[in-house]
Amino acid sequence: MDIPSLSPYAFKFGPIAVHWYGIFMAISIAVGGYYLYKQATKLNYDEDFLLNLLMIVVIFGVIGARLMFVLANYPEWFVKDPVQVFKIYEGGLSWHGAVLGGFLAGLYYCRKKGVRINPLEDFAVVGLALGNMLVRVGNIFNHEVLGRPTEFFFGRWPAQLVGVAIGAFLLIRYFYVQKKHMPDGYQFWSFIFYYQLLRGVFEETVKDVPLVWPVYLNEEWGIGLFTMTQVATPFILILAYWMIKRVLNDPNRQYYD
């Protein structure tokens, strides 16, 4: 299966090029931020607080995403070619870095203002799931996050489409669970759990990335174990599961409609 010859540029204005990757990321941020804002105002969160929170989370989310990607893949850029670190428009963001950076910044700001974060992190799931789905589409245009070659009839695993499917499934799951009246905090941590499980099992197994712990590699089938993400998966699953149990067993747990 040949990789389609798609341009990474949506359009150009002279020397300025607008990338599909950036457009899809901006759409996910805008839609996710708008959803969080509308839902949180229904719970009487202050509008100015929410706007400031969204700005802080987006900024530190992008910073965290880029820094973790560079640290994991091209740490030499910091010394040999630091300009490359800032070329976000060319792609190269870590989903885990985005979540970590945005979460820590949001947690700090909420605690500083004395505001409960659990409902807000639940509402953020829409932006996270949509972002994973759309950014993987952007990866297709950038010709990155490729699957491994395989001797199956399709020639190469469509790793980006696997990521799109994971994001779509988790987005649908969010709205389904939202009808179940679960305690606040459950949506976010269950999302983290299932995202990591699905990505570690399905996407990473066929993605053409180095195996940091090469336990198994079948070049004919195009599958391999274990990538860096897969090595980290058990620890993330344990953390997410522990947080889920904590939310469900909290005697002071709260609910929202």
Swiss-Prot record:
<keyword id="KW-1003">Cell membrane</keyword>
<feature type="transmembrane region" description="Helical">
    <location>
        <begin position="123"/>
        <end position="143"/>
    </location>
</feature>
<feature type="transmembrane region" description="Helical">
    <location>
        <begin position="49"/>
        <end position="69"/>
    </location>
</feature>
<dbReference type="GO" id="GO:0005886">
    <property type="term" value="C:plasma membrane"/>
</dbReference>
<protein>
    <recommendedName>
        <fullName>Phosphatidylglycerol--prolipoprotein diacylglyceryl transferase</fullName>
        <ecNumber>2.5.1.145</ecNumber>
    </recommendedName>
</protein>
<dbReference type="InterPro" id="IPR001640">
    <property type="entry name" value="Lgt"/>
</dbReference>
<feature type="transmembrane region" description="Helical">
    <location>
        <begin position="186"/>
        <end position="202"/>
    </location>
</feature>
<dbReference type="GO" id="GO:0008961">
    <property type="term" value="F:phosphatidylglycerol-prolipoprotein diacylglyceryl transferase activity"/>
</dbReference>
<feature type="transmembrane region" description="Helical">
    <location>
        <begin position="223"/>
        <end position="243"/>
    </location>
</feature>
<keyword id="KW-0808">Transferase</keyword>
<keyword id="KW-0472">Membrane</keyword>
<comment type="function">
    <text>Catalyzes the transfer of the diacylglyceryl group from phosphatidylglycerol to the sulfhydryl group of the N-terminal cysteine of a prolipoprotein, the first step in the formation of mature lipoproteins.</text>
</comment>
<feature type="transmembrane region" description="Helical">
    <location>
        <begin position="88"/>
        <end position="108"/>
    </location>
</feature>
<feature type="transmembrane region" description="Helical">
    <location>
        <begin position="13"/>
        <end position="33"/>
    </location>
</feature>
<dbReference type="Pfam" id="PF01790">
    <property type="entry name" value="LGT"/>
</dbReference>
<dbReference type="GO" id="GO:0042158">
    <property type="term" value="P:lipoprotein biosynthetic process"/>
</dbReference>
<feature type="transmembrane region" description="Helical">
    <location>
        <begin position="152"/>
        <end position="172"/>
    </location>
</feature>
<keyword id="KW-1133">Transmembrane helix</keyword>
<comment type="pathway">
    <text>Protein modification; lipoprotein biosynthesis (diacylglyceryl transfer).</text>
</comment>
<feature type="binding site">
    <location>
        <position position="136"/>
    </location>
    <ligand>
        <name>a 1,2-diacyl-sn-glycero-3-phospho-(1'-sn-glycerol)</name>
    </ligand>
</feature>
<comment type="similarity">
    <text>Belongs to the Lgt family.</text>
</comment>
<keyword id="KW-0812">Transmembrane</keyword>
